[in-house]
Structure formats: structure tokens, C-alpha cells
Amino acid sequence: RMLKRRMIKLLEKLLSQRDGIHSEYGALLRYTQDYHKRLSIIRKVLVQEKEMFEGRKVSDRIVSIDRHYVRPIVRGKENKSVEFGAKVNNIQIDGISFIEHLSFKAFNEGIRLKDCIRMQQKLMNVRVRCVAADSIYANNANRKFCTKYGISTSFVRKGRAAKDEPLRKVLRSELSKERATRLEGSFGTQKQHYSLSRIKARNRKTEILWIFFGIHTANAILMIEKIRNKTAKAA
């Protein structure tokens, strides 16, 4: 804690010295746009660090001066409680992945199921009949939406069992199995083989492009394999 206090005081002193030089020689100095941007970020970081040092919570904390758009995202995983970088909400149609939403800030993907379904229907021009999704999507609003439009889901049933519950249970099991093998498997493939485990881009635009090309390069390879298998069967 003492070291942190000293670091904050040192940064305050350096900024004060910089402001003194600027007030005296500012007319003779020429600053780049990038310089002004970085200086503004450093000032924000100082304010945030002082607030945290005083025990106040900072909701929009900057964790990197170079990548100032990145925010800490609480994941709740055993090996990584907090992650830094883009959070992507994907949909998958017949093994092909599409980016439904991407953000460098935390968001609740559980409220995005309706958007996912609408996106799939817009892409395929076919009404969605079945949906397999993580338990975070199984909220009451999504359940009501799916029931209203006759969409079967992998969600664990709430309330009394229907007459055809055995059939529904089989369908839920199959949907969950497909999701586990296809969607979860695709995440590992994209990270291991398409450079998404460690993104080395240095700004927001190139980072988004890196993610986009990683996902869609994996899609392209999968589509080539599908065409090859289809051709082999037809031969």
C-alpha cells in the first residue's frame, strides 16, 4: 500500500512538472494528436487509481494505456476469475460461427437470445425451430419468447411436466449434446489453430479484425471440408 501511494504521488508530480513546462513553453511546443490522447488517458488513470486507493469502486477501470478501450471482465472461471480483451457472443448454424455481438466491456449475453434468433432468421431466411444455449440464456423472458414462437430449447424444464415430457427430454438431451460437441469444440479449435488464444493486435480496429478473420478462417476451412465430404459421397 505504501508503494502504491508513492507511485500515485510520483505520477502526480510528473504531471505537475509537465503542466509547468507547458504553461511556460507551450507556445513553442508542438504536440501530436496521439500525445494529447495518451496524456488524457494517463490523467484518467491517475484519477481512477486515487479512487481505488481510497477504497472506492471504479466501474469503468482503464487497465492499459496503449489499449485503453479494454476493460476487466469478470468471468467466474476457476483458472481465470477476470479476463481482459474482447467478449464475443457467437451463434452457430450447422457448425458455422457468426459474431452476434462483440464488446471490450462486460455485457450480459443472457439477454441477447432474441437478437441471436433474429440474426439467424435474417441470415438463413428460415424460421428457427430449435435452440441450444448455455444455462445463462435460460431466463424467464427467453423461455416465454421461445414458447410464444414454438421454439424448442435445451433449457432444463421449470414447473410441471407436460404430457410429452419424455420426448421433450430426448430433444433437450440431443440439443445439449450438439451444442457441447459443435459450439464448445469450435471455441477450442479457433483458439488453438487460428490465433485467438493470444491476440497480439495493438489497437481496437486491428483486434476486431484479428477476431473476425480467426473465426471466419475457421469457418472457411470447415466449409471446404463439408464440400469435400459431399463430393466424395456423391462420387
Predicted features and spans:
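Anion-binding and metal-coordination hotspots
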Residues: R1-A235
